Amino acid sequence: MTGNAKLIDRVSAINWNRLQDEKDAEVWDRLTGNFWLPEKVPVSNDIPSWGTLTAGEKQLTMRVFTGLTMLDTIQGTVGAVSLIPDALTPHEEAVLTNIAFMESVHAKSYSQIFSTLCSTAEIDDAFRWSEENRNLQRKAEIVLQYYRGDEPLKRKVASTLLESFLFYSGFYLPMYWSSRAKLTNTADMIRLIIRDEAVHGYYIGYKFQRGLALVDDVTRAELKDYTYELLFELYDNEVEYTQDLYDEVGLTEDVKKFLRYNANKALMNLGYEALFPRDETDVNPAILSALSPNADENHDFFSGSGSSYVIGKAVVTEDDDWDF
């Protein structure tokens, strides 16, 4: 050991009985209460419904889910992790580790769907497409650029836009199928993911606003300009990505409205004014209905389960019950 080496003389354990920010405990409890795993959703019940889709509709669905997998991979392995060094409290660090883990659960969820409904060749083709699609790769490049930078508040902006905006061009399609009574178990799983992402976007946006209160007015103005510039850049790319995916099935304009609707929600999470007027965000009511907790699948956004979510029940037994 060299003479210049310095040992850490004290390490503090996280104490949940001493909170600097009550929001950390509130969000932790919400996230852990919402915990779920994809293996508990019986996607196999959607096999007959999958068979009613055309070859083009199947390809579209797989490409949409592959794009979502890429975003979850980025958020789970880079995005949420990159926010940890800038956490203001140890409890915030804990929440961010939970977020990172659940993003990896989300990424695995799509593989669960693929392995149930698709052939290996189809899966490989979809992942190959994700690596070759210019707009999908550009989306990842833009976000990663800020995750790997050295400006904590800009990282939070990029993360909030990913959580609250970028996912939604993909989330549209399973809600569309669900509104037509197709792939309803898959839609139930996507609702579980959407519920998580809503909490993630809210929390990271909240932490951005807390950090914003600590900087001067000039920096605040610069960050606001940056946020809208980044949103415009991401939105323009997302429109091209949406056209590439949805033009053939005639859904592009509806998806764009859904994008603008969620872009406004992302800005609100960051404490900023909505960008798009109401007449440009009038989402198809069937999609909003499919998103709601009272959708046909009776998904409960707050209990951690939907009608498709299966959990074993404990039954009291006696020794004689095990004599076969």
From Swiss-Prot:
- List the protein's name: Ribonucleoside-diphosphate reductase subunit beta nrdF2
Cited PANTHER family: RIBONUCLEOSIDE-DIPHOSPHATE REDUCTASE SMALL CHAIN, RIBONUCLEOSIDE-DIPHOSPHATE REDUCTASE SUBUNIT M2
What the record says about family reads: Belongs to the ribonucleoside diphosphate reductase small chain family.
| Chain positions recorded as Fe cation 1 binding sites | 103, 106, 197
Q: What is the source species?
A: Mycobacterium tuberculosis (strain ATCC 25618 / H37Rv)
Which keywords label this protein? Deoxyribonucleotide synthesis, Iron, Metal-binding, Oxidoreductase
Where along the chain is Fe cation 2 bound? 103, 163, 197, 200
What does the entry's cofactor note say about binding and number? Binds 2 iron ions per subunit.
Annotated catalytic residues: 110
Q: What is the lineage of its organism?
A: Bacteria, Bacillati, Actinomycetota, Actinomycetes, Mycobacteriales
